[in-house]
Amino acid sequence: MQATNLKTNHLTQPLGIDAGTLFLSWQCAEGVRQTAYEIEVTAGAETLWASGKALGSVMHTETPSAVPPKTQGRWRIRLWDENDQPGAWSTASFETGLAQADWQGVWVCPETEEPDIDCADAINAFAKPNWEQKQAALEASGKGQAQPYQPHRPASYLRKTFTAPAGESKRLYITAKGLYAAWLNGKRVGDMVLAPGSFTADKHLGAQTYDVTALVREGENKLLIALGDGWYRSTSGVDGDRDLFGKEVAVLFQLEVDGKAVCISDDDMEATQCGPIRQNDMQQGEVYDARLEGELSGWHDVKTEPNSLPITGMNTVPIREQEAFAGRLLRTPNGETVLDFGQNMAGYVEMKLTAHAGQKLRLLCGEALDENGNFTQENFQDRNRHKEGGTAQMLELVCKEGENHYKPSFTIMGFRYTKVETDIDLTGAEFTAHAVYSEMPVTGSFACGDADVDQLVKNSVWSQKGNFCDIPTDCPTRERAGWTGDMGVFIETGLTLMDCYPVVEKWLAECRLNQYPDGRMANIAPPTSRPGYMTPMLCMSAGWGDAAILVPYALYKRTGDRKILADNYQMMQKWYAFLLGRAQQTTEEQQTGAYAKYTVLNGLDYGEWCEPGITPMQAMMNPRKSVGTAYLAYSGRLLAEIAQALGKAEDAAQYRDTAEKAVKAYRTAFTDNGKITSDRQCEYVRAIAFALLGEEESQAAADTLNRMVAENGYHLNTGFLSTPFLCEVLAKYGYADTAYKLLLQDTAPSWLYEVKQGATTVWETWTGIDANGHPSESLNHYSYGAICGWLFGGVCGIHLAGETLTIAPTPNPALGWAKAVYDSPVGRIESGWQYAGDAVTYTITVPCNRTAEVTLPDGRSLTLQPGTHTL
């Protein structure tokens, strides 16, 4: 037996993680059962920890003591099998980054004066008229003085020449206020794009560590760094706010040879803004003048600032270019030249073409064609609110003579289609779309007898790819915001479809930083706009704030890593105390009885967001909405389990007590002695899924829910919070046929309507493109892709929670056959079934070192050993 897939802090061969204890995990290959393991952690010739032979089948452990900063370490592991025979050693490497006190450099700011920017370029041509109109209206209203339009800025370039000694180990530690790209002696450092990533950058930043041993030579070296605006000061969110975290971009770096700094960021540098990137903005786009390629000019001195901002290590996976798609040229009815890349994605377009000097080419990126087949961005629906007239997603290339090759550096866009505006002859031109997202392997695959369902799963994966660029976001176009509610409903599915633990863990750190002192949760982390009048009120919303509990809990249950609970425990406690505090404000006029003070009726909630037939305002203003009380019960139970896992028995008892009182409060306030009388599907789904009713009451509620779905023509009528549970609760209480009819429904509202409309990602709303072909809202939102959780966990029945693997498939002739494959933290799990007449054959694969408790629809229960089984 041998250990495989070794990970350190859920990362493969990490470089530059924070110092501290290490979470070490592995999988087992060969053999049946691991009976013991032995681990050795070393740094050079020094042994940092040796476990000795540790008995047990667990496939993870934590080092008992912290690993220091700047440690280039290795760990190796061997396993004993069921016959007590040891296998061969397996080895992995890791490296910790700088501690805060190790940084010797200062922040270097390249901009010393306002740049001279041509306002006739692409970005300003779009934004300036709208800006001036809004400012004139502001002044006319007497609410403020009109401000002049500020053009988007060029990228800055910084250079430094330094001398390096010979050495065996050379590291570049670097971060930026903004985005950076670095070159050593003319060669690009690393392959991460949009570095250093997305942070609440006025509170902390993360730094990357690069192994530059092959790039730094003995003697003289040249370092070049490009800086863009990035998340730091670009236009952001639906409001189009700029400078959210600061007004000046800057870089901080330290280059070491064998552990000693030989080059740091300081005032002994030069900078210029005269490079080819004339304007850059994460949301709006880039202007690139190829005539300025080559030797840079206009070098000047820099400014510096002390380094007082907390800097963490590279505790996540890098953002990289991933799949590439060639564009298909088409002509629209309006005569537009449009490229169709065939896949909605987040990324950018690379172009190669021949032109004359000064000729221009402009690209506008969007998700859809309109009902007439013409290019549109109107589905972004942010034109009126956005300070620059909406999300531009523009690229402009000013060509040099001859061959031109341009790929954006400091922007990202959500698109499938690109409109091309140019007088250049495009014969022989090449346009390639690059998908850009965090390095996350796909871990879940599903196939069945219905091609549309297969496409739904593919769409869900692509929406996850398009919205996991360093942090999970709602959409890659209009908002690009790390909404808590979206992650709360999708986390279980997301962990199955892709190995996203590091991305979500990083985002939780942003949630902690942005939590209000009174416990309410920022709906978006990091922030994408300046807070408005309603912001603090909406940040008390149940379901959204509960992501503080739901998300760490899900990460823990999949991996067994208690550190994720410990890191976020205070955030969970503060949120839950705030939610309970809302309940404690309940007055006798609102609710009476022994459990009135556990009924959440005060404050503002988003409610059952995007529920068909209910406007957002109706969802929020319903004075008797049950959402808050339901989550007080549900999250309280989870928090009790979390406290127990952390060894906090008193806390656990307190949270269990509160949760059970909230259950009784729910029954008192929102049921008639356990009977739900609502005409909304969501009320039944939530009450059943959250175990707010007794077993017989849940069955009665499911009976009613089934009837409501049938009377609605087998269409769902649920919204944001309850849709992920809909098919699950129907199938659990005997209505699998109804669940399958919902799954296979292809008229709106349904999951397959968008597939029939040609979608390649999941939409924000059920009718993102209506029956007339008119697009609206975001066409790349992962939230409703949560149905895939039921395909894996219901249709094929795979459930992994810590050490426990259960498989309980729910076959149905409507699909004919189905198979799910999950490359889980404990190894590959497979579950499939196929009909042959009335007979069903099941095929199940259990990974090494696990057993599976299998329950079949005919009532049989089996315990399966590792291997593939046909039943």
Predicted regions and their residues:
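Active/binding-pocket-proximal capping segment
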Residues: 180, 188-191, 195-196, 511, ...
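C-terminal capping/lid segments that line or modulate ligand- or cofactor-binding pockets
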Residues: 285-289, 479, 497, 547-549, ...
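Alpha-helix capping and helix-loop boundary segments enriched in small/acidic/polar residues
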Residues: 146-150, 166, 171, 197-201, ...
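Active-site acid/base region of carbohydrate-active enzymes
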Residues: 179, 261-266, 272-273, 425-459, ...
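Extracellular/oxidizing-compartment recognition motifs
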Residues: 1-477, 486, 500-505, 522-529, ...
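Non-catalytic C-terminal accessory modules of carbohydrate-active enzymes
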Residues: 247, 252, 264, 268-292, ...
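Alpha-helical support elements that line or immediately flank enzyme active sites
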Residues: 170, 174, 348-367, 421, ...
